[in-house]
From Swiss-Prot:
Lineage: Bacteria, Pseudomonadati, Thermodesulfobacteriota, Syntrophobacteria, Syntrophobacterales
Protein family (similarity comment): Belongs to the universal ribosomal protein uS17 family.
Species per Swiss-Prot/TrEMBL record: Syntrophobacter fumaroxidans (strain DSM 10017 / MPOB)
This protein's name: Small ribosomal subunit protein uS17
Ribosomal protein recorded as keyword: yes
GO MF annotations, alphabetized: rRNA binding; structural constituent of ribosome
GO cellular component, one term: cytosolic small ribosomal subunit
Functional summary from the UniProt entry: One of the primary rRNA binding proteins, it binds specifically to the 5'-end of 16S ribosomal RNA.
């Protein structure tokens, strides 16, 4: 991968939907520790990301990077596809 541009956040997630043109919905999961019950809870966030080549399919693992606002909801860009989904 190329050198990181300073100040831009990156996330690794899974493609949840690719029904829009040049846009994918990426779900990013993280584990948090509950302070009282000492259990790990799975939390997730959904991000709309720009996919210029329409290369991503549902189930792919991708790296997304923060960018300028592209539309009302899109502020992320797909940088790299890590794993292709097995069909």
């Amino acid at each position: 991968m190329e050198e990181q541009k300073s100040g831009r956040k990156t996330r690794v997630g899974r493609v949840l939907s690719n029904k829009m043109d040049k846009t994918v919905v990426v779900v990013v999961e993280r584990l948090i520790h509950h302070p009282q019950y000492h259990k790990f809870i799975r939390r997730q966030n959904k991000f709309k990301a720009h996919d210029a080549q329409n290369a991503c399919r549902v189930g792919d693992r991708v790296i997304i990077e923060e960018s300028r606002p592209i539309s009302k909801d899109k502020r992320w860009v797909v940088v790299q596809v890590l794993d292709k989904a097995v069909i």
